[in-house]
Amino acid sequence: MTQFTDIDKLAVSTIRILAVDTVSKANSGHPGAPLGMAPAAHVLWSQMRMNPTNPDWINRDRFVLSNGHAVALLYSMLHLTGYDLSIEDLKQFRQLGSRTPGHPEFELPGVEVTTGPLGQGISNAVGMAMAQANLAATYNKPGFTLSDNYTYVFLGDGCLQEGISSEASSLAGHLKLGNLIAIYDDNKITIDGATSISFDEDVAKRYEAYGWEVLYVENGNEDLAGIAKAIAQAKLSKDKPTLIKMTTTIGYGSLHAGSHSVHGAPLKADDVKQLKSKFGFNPDKSFVVPQEVYDHYQKTILKPGVEANNKWNKLFSEYQKKFPELGAELARRLSGQLPANWESKLPTYTAKDSAVATRKLSETVLEDVYNQLPELIGGSADLTPSNLTRWKEALDFQPPSSGSGNYSGRYIRYGIREHAMGAIMNGISAFGANYKPYGGTFLNFVSYAAGAVRLSALSGHPVIWVATHDSIGVGEDGPTHQPIETLAHFRSLPNIQVWRPADGNEVSAAYKNSLESKHTPSIIALSRQNLPQLEGSSIESASKGGYVLQDVANPDIILVATGSEVSLSVEAAKTLAAKNIKARVVSLPDFFTFDKQPLEYRLSVLPDNVPIMSVEVLATTCWGKYAHQSFGIDRFGASGKAPEVFKFFGFTPEGVAERAQKTIAFYKGDKLISPLKKAF
């Protein structure tokens, strides 16, 4: 067991004062949790295996700050332990353009995931632990332990109150993730006051019921040995994740310690002075780090981390010689590259092929590419038979003791936990090794996971949502299951691909773009009902996000559509042709990708001087960027047989043609410019 001395106490005091100075300089932030959690941070980081000079080393221990408001603690630790974060960076905390934003963001070396919305971090940590278990089961060999890292997470009462933490923690217990250790900052304070006003459940019993090991540290403010003992004991648990319930005092050392007033506001000047005096620091100086503290962390963290990384590099070099195929595969994954020519396995179709639901075409893609992509790992939120997300030879990701799979399996049974699924996918992606996680549910229920989807986009995790039952085509299940506003919501997010493919070639294009994406997540919205294969579609064209599917010379109108309404627009164009009205049909499967194309190309698809009408059985919000007139559904759906529901809302060839004629008449004589053209 580690023996703690005066240098450890000085290091803890330094962390506390540095975090307080960081918040005070910004005159904004959260000093309370860092003051209470500093001892745990010091002890944990002194035991974690990491290399600050190579923060992306694949076998490093991961640290997730789920209570992201305590980020001054994380920034202090990154600075003290040798990461690329200077005192000047700390002084710029929460300032525009700084490297130290108000909550942890994934881009900073040493920050594993973006946190802040409570409950996301613990769920990300579950994903990281799952990824590690899969990597180890896939590549470890006797004498060659390439992957054995732990994932550690700090979380607070707020995280535990969020429903997502229950979803993720329940799954972690089921999966017996012994590589996951969570330290619960039990300070009994929330923003409104004591937790007793709204939160008095027995957290320990709750986590025991989930299948976790639960350990206790009664004095997290000072008991370094007790914290170290709990972490060491947690690492002995190989078939259960561990929750260390650590009692702390929020704002420890402050005049307002133990109260909610110290949670989210800088300490007053007199409080800072007495705090510094109490911990042996000059009350008139700020951002002071004793050299012996730097030296201590250099000795206990930086030097051992570099040595461990070098040792791993030698081991991997030997591994590549003994297991050349696996070694080359892992090296490729660590470089962030997909296998050469993997896309040649994507299925292609002609208009003579039979009509098939795009969810079924998605299943075909997964079936065709899974052997090519060992980094592909996915599942469904208890909708596998509906989402069609499991390839025939898939092995479930399950604890070996379950008898129904093992950790080398790449199909995840998420249960009915959409929000956790989204955050877990973020964690799997953030782990590294080029993991490509996907998760299936109904499109309408991706909304349950909106918080996780937003963080995917903000962080640049290229996760994939396989979102089936994408419209009123759901039919009898009715408006509770029929998405209306869902795509408009997610299309409004920055940095996300939202695909709604119309046929097999477009489904393949959606997967191609999504799997090749480095920093952008994707939602692939798929139909329940059969759709025809289209004349004029191709993977190459659809990969641009939008293209001319069927053209005529000098069109009177352009019909631009997505998904099931593309084939409907083709039929409407025939109806119009019978009336001597010429219509171009444009398919626009993904706005985001189309917007990335050169303006010249986009204007060739949606040009000036022709009225453009969008056709989509969803909310018309967002279509103003591409169409002069929109035909959609801006009310909730209806229960009934799908063809009857389409007819009820006017989505028939005749209904589309009628509205196209009205659009032509409305804009007749006007000098139209493309909606793509804007002043700025």
From Swiss-Prot:
Catalytic residues (positions): 418
Impact when changing residue 69 to A: Reduces catalytic activity by about 98%. Decreased affinity for donor substrate
Cofactor note: Binds 1 Mg(2+) ion per subunit. Can also utilize other divalent metal cations, such as Ca(2+), Mn(2+) and Co(2+). Binds 1 thiamine pyrophosphate per subunit.
Cofactor(s) the protein needs: Mg(2+); Ca(2+); Mn(2+); Co(2+)
Record-linked SUPFAM superfamilies: Thiamin diphosphate-binding fold (THDP-binding), TK C-terminal domain-like
PROSITE patterns: TRANSKETOLASE_1, TRANSKETOLASE_2
Positions contributing to Mg(2+) binding: 157, 187, 189
Binding site for thiamine diphosphate: 69, 116-118, 158, 187, 263, 418, 445
UniProt site (Important for catalytic activity): 30, 263
Recorded catalytic activity of this chain's protein: D-sedoheptulose 7-phosphate + D-glyceraldehyde 3-phosphate = aldehydo-D-ribose 5-phosphate + D-xylulose 5-phosphate
Gene Ontology MF: a single term: metal ion binding
Pfam families: Transket_pyr (PF02779), Transketolase_C_1 (PF22613), Transketolase_N (PF00456)
Gene Ontology CC annotations of this record: cytoplasm; cytosol
Outcome recorded upon mutating residue 103 to F: Loss of activity
Single Gene Ontology BP annotation: pentose-phosphate shunt
Task of the protein: Catalyzes the transfer of a two-carbon ketol group from a ketose donor to an aldose acceptor, via a covalent intermediate with the cofactor thiamine pyrophosphate.
Subunit structure: Homodimer.
Additional note from the record: Present with 40300 molecules/cell in log phase SD medium.
Family in the record: Belongs to the transketolase family.
Protein name from the UniProt record: Transketolase 1
GN (gene name): TKL1
